[in-house]
UniProtKB/Swiss-Prot annotation:
The modification Phosphoserine is found at S83, S165, S196, S211. Forms multimers and multimerization is required for stable binding to chromatin. Interacts with HDAC1 and HDAC2 via its C-terminal acetyl-CoA-binding domain. Interacts with EZH2, EED, SUZ12, REST, EHMT1 and EHMT2. Part of a complex containing at least CDYL, REST, WIZ, SETB1, EHMT1 and EHMT2. Part of a complex containing at least CDYL, MIER1, MIER2, HDAC1 and HDAC2. Interacts with CHAF1A and CHAF1B; bridging the CAF-1 complex to the MCM2-7 (MCM) complex. Interacts with MCM3 and MCM5; bridging the CAF-1 complex to the MCM2-7 (MCM) complex. Residues 56-304 are annotated as: Interaction with EZH2. The gene is Cdyl. Residues 117-129 have a biased composition (Low complexity). One of its GO terms (cellular component) is cytoplasm. The modification N6-methyllysine is found at K130. Transmembrane segments: none annotated. This is Chromodomain Y-like protein. Residues 1-30, 110-158, 200-223 are annotated as: Disordered. Residues 1-14, 133-146 have a biased composition (Polar residues). Induction: Down-regulated upon neuronal activity in the hippocampus. Up-regulated after social defeat stress. The keyword Acyltransferase applies.
Length: 593
C-alpha cells in the first residue's frame, strides 16, 4: 500500500489518491488511503466532492477507533481491493456512507451481546451480580451507536458517551452492601432467590443457623446468593407456606439450639450406675433431664465422621458445602426441616438431611416428615419416589439420644409413643402403591437397613455398607426384618445379621439380594439419575399395577410382622433391663468418642 510519487496540486487530488497497484481513475469517485487527513487540507470538516460519492466505492466498514484528538475514524474496505488496502477514514469523510456505519454498529453490538451471554452462562452464582455492570455497559454502548450522527457536534456527544462507558467499565464491582440496594429490574437481570422457610434467624458467613458458635452447614443460605440450579427448577403442585407446612407436619420453628451440651464430662459411673433414686431414675437419666443430652457419636463403629461438624472444621471443604447448600436451595415444591423434597419431572425425590439428629438417624419428627412426603407423592402425578440422603451416611437407624431424653418422664408412655411412631412409619412403606427406589450413598444401619426390603429397587454406592446390630443396641429387630431378611438372603445369613450384627459390604449385600446393583462412587449420582429418568418415562399405570402384583401376597403378612415387632419393642423399652442395655450402648459410644 503506497502513495503516488507526484505531489498532488489540489485538495481533490489528495483525497482521491488510490493505491499504486490499481489503475489511476479518471473520475472523482474514490477516497483517500492515508491514515490521516493531509495537512494541506484547509477545511477538514468539509468533505470533498469525491468523498461525497464514496458510497459507490465503499464495500463495508470493518472497524472503528479514536485518534489522538478523540475523533472517530472508521476502517473502510474498498470495492475491488483486499484487506491490505483498508484505510482509516475520518467520520466527516463518510457523509454518504451512513448505511455502512449503521450496519457496522449493529453487528458490533450483536457481537458484544453474544459475548456477554456466553460469559453469563459460564459465570458462577457468586458472579451473578457482575452481569449488572455488563448489562449497563451494553446499554450505554447501544445508546452510543444510536446517538452517532455524522457531524462535528454529534461526534462530541458520542465521544462523551463512549468515555462514560469506558469509565464505568473500569470501575470495580460494587460492594455487597451496595448490591443489595441496586434495582435489578432496571438492569434487565432477573435473579430468582428462594426465601428461607424460617424467618428471624441470624445469618453468619452466608448460612442461617442456630448460633455463630455452632453453625450447621446444611442451613439455608443467605438470600443474596443463589445456586445455579435454582432457575432450572420449575415447581409443580401446590406451594405451602412455612406456617402451613409446619402445622401440617406437626413441627414448630427452631429458635434455640436443639441439643444443649453438658458442661462437664460424663463419667462411666453415670451411665453404668443404675441405682434408682426417689424418682425411679438413674443418675445418668438425671443428668440427661437436667442438661438435655450429651455430645455422643451415635453411629456404630465404622462411621468415622458425622454429617455435621463445626463450620471451622469444614473450611477446607468448599465443594461439599456448596453441595449441601445447593440441595437446600433447589427444593421446589415443599419445605421440611429434616428432609428435602424435590418435585422432579415424573418423580419425587426425598433426601434425608436431618437437623434434629446426627447422621440422618430417625426420630418421630423425621418419620412424620417422611410419611408426609410419601403421602403427598402418592396423591400427585409422581410415577415413583426416589429416596436418598445428604452427606456421607444414608441412615443410622433410631435416634437413641432423642429416645432416652424422654424416658425420664414416663418410661411406659414414651416407649408406647416410640413404638407407635415406628409402626406407622413402616406401614407407610408397606402400603405405598407407587414404586420406591432407594439410592444408598453410605452406611445403612438398624432401621435404615431394615426398610430397604420394603422398597422396590435398591442401588448402592461402592462405599456403602449394611448392618443391623440390634443385640448391641439392646433391642429386638424392627422394620419387618424378621420376615424380609430370611425371604431375601435365607435364614442363616439373616440370623447372622440380626443376632450378631454382621456388617455387609455393598458387593456382599448385592450378592445376597439386599441390593439390586452397585455403582462406583464417582459416577453414582449420574448412574442413578439416568435409570430414574428411564423409569419415570414409563406408563404410571403399568408401574403401579406391576408393584401390586409383586406385593399382593405379602402386604398382610408384613403388617402383622410389623405389629408383632413393635409390641416386643414396647415391652423391652418399658423394662429396666431394656434401659440398662441402651445406657450401656451409649456409654460405649461415649468411650469411643
Amino acid at each position: 500500500m503506497g502513495i503516488g510519487n507526484s505531489q498532488p496540486n489540489s485538495q481533490e487530488a489528495q483525497l482521491c489518491t488510490l493505491p499504486e497497484k490499481a489503475e489511476q481513475p479518471t473520475d472523482d469517485n474514490t477516497c483517500q488511503q492515508n491514515n490521516v487527513v493531509p495537512a494541506t487540507v484547509s477545511e477538514p470538516d468539509q468533505a470533498s466532492p469525491a468523498i461525497q460519492d464514496a458510497e459507490t466505492q465503499v464495500e463495508s466498514i470493518v472497524d472503528k477507533r479514536k485518534n489522538k484528538k478523540g475523533k472517530t475514524e472508521y476502517l473502510v474496505r474498498w470495492k475491488g481491493y483486499d484487506s491490505e488496502d483498508d484505510t482509516w477514514e475520518p467520520e466527516q469523510h463518510l457523509v454518504n456512507c451512513e448505511e455502512y456505519i449503521h450496519d457496522f454498529n449493529r453487528r458490533h453490538n450483536e457481537r458484544q451481546k453474544e459475548g456477554s451471554l456466553a460469559r453469563a452462562s459460564r459465570a458462577s452464582p457468586s458472579n451473578a451480580r457482575k452481569q449488572i455492570s455488563r448489562s449497563t455497559h451494553s446499554t450505554l454502548s447501544k445508546t452510543n451507536s444510536k446517538a452517532l450522527v455524522v457531524g462535528k457536534d454529534h461526534e462530541s456527544k458520542s465521544s462523551q458517551l463512549l468515555a462514560a462507558s469506558q469509565k464505568f467499565r473500569k470501575n470495580p464491582a460494587p460492594s455487597l452492601a451496595n448490591r443489595k440496594n441496586m434495582d435489578l429490574a432496571k438492569s434487565g437481570i432477573k435473579i430468582l432467590v428462594p426465601k428461607s422457610p424460617v424467618k428471624g434467624r441470624t445469618s453468619v458467613d452466608g448460612f442461617q443457623g442456630e448460633s455463630p458458635e455452632k453453625l450447621d452447614p446444611v442451613d439455608q443460605g443467605a438470600e443474596d446468593t443463589v445456586a445455579p440450579e435454582v432457575t432450572a427448577e420449575k415447581p409443580t403442585g401446590a406451594l405451602l407456606g412455612p406456617g402451613a407446612e409446619r402445622a401440617r407436619m406437626g413441627s414448630r420453628p427452631r429458635i434455640h439450639p436443639l441439643v444443649p451440651q453438658v458442661s462437664g464430662p460424663v463419667t462411666a459411673a453415670m451411665a453404668t450406675g443404675l441405682a434408682v433414686n426417689g424418682k425411679g431414675t438413674s443418675p445418668f437419666m438425671d443428668a440427661l433431664a437436667a442438661n438435655g443430652t450429651v455430645t455422643i457419636q451415635t453411629s456404630v463403629t465404622g462411621v468415622t465422621a458425622g454429617k455435621r461438624k463445626f463450620i471451622d472444621d469444614r473450611r477446607d471443604q468448599p465443594f461439599d458445602k456448596r453441595l449441601r447448600f445447593s440441595v437446600r436451595q433447589t427444593e421446589s415444591a415443599y419445605r421440611y426441616r429434616d428432609i428435602v423434597v424435590r418435585k422432579q419431572d415424573g418423580f419425587t425425590h426425598i433426601l434425608l438431611s436431618t437437623k434434629s439428629s446426627e447422621n440422618n438417624s430417625l426420630n418421630p419428627e423425621v418419620m412424620k416428615e417422611v410419611q408426609s412426603a410419601l403421602s403427598t407423592a402418592a396423591a400427585d402425578d409422581s410415577k415413583l419416589v426416589l429416596l436418598s440422603a445428604v452427606g456421607s451416611v444414608f441412615c443410622c437407624g433410631l435416634d437413641f439420644i432423642y429416645f432416652i431424653r424422654r424416658l425420664t418422664d414416663d418410661r411406659k408412655r414414651e416407649s408406647t409413643k416410640m413404638a407407635d411412631a415406628i409402626r406407622n412409619f413402616v406401614n407407610t412403606f408397606i402400603q405405598f402403591k407407587k414404586p420406591i427406589i432407594v439410592a444408598v450413598n453410605g452406611p445403612a444401619i438398624g432401621l435404615g437397613a431394615s426398610i430397604l426390603p420394603l422398597c422396590d429397587v435398591v442401588w448402592a454406592n461402592e462405599k456403602a455398607w449394611f448392618q443391623t446390630p440390634y443385640t448391641t443396641f439392646g433391642q429386638s429387630p424392627d422394620g419387618c426384618s424378621t420376615v424380609m431378611f430370611p425371604k431375601i438372603m435365607g435364614g442363616a445369613s439373616a440370623n447372622e445379621m440380626l443376632f450378631s450384627g454382621r456388617k455387609l459390604t455393598a458387593q456382599e449385600a448385592c450378592g445376597k439380594g439386599l441390593v439390586s446393583q452397585v455403582f462406583w462412587p464417582g459416577t453414582f449420582t449420574q448412574e442413578v439419575m439416568v435409570r430414574i429418568k428411564e423409569l419415570a418415562s414409563c406408563n404410571p399405570v403399568v408401574l403401579e399395577e406391576s408393584k401390586a402384583l409383586v406385593r399382593c401376597n405379602m402386604k398382610m403378612e408384613l403388617e402383622q410382622a410389623n405389629e408383632r415387632e413393635c409390641e416386643v419393642l414396647k415391652k423391652i423399652w418399658g423394662s429396666a433391663q431394656g434401659m440398662d442395655s441402651m445406657l450401656k450402648y451409649l456409654q460405649r459410644k461415649i468411650d469411643e468418642f
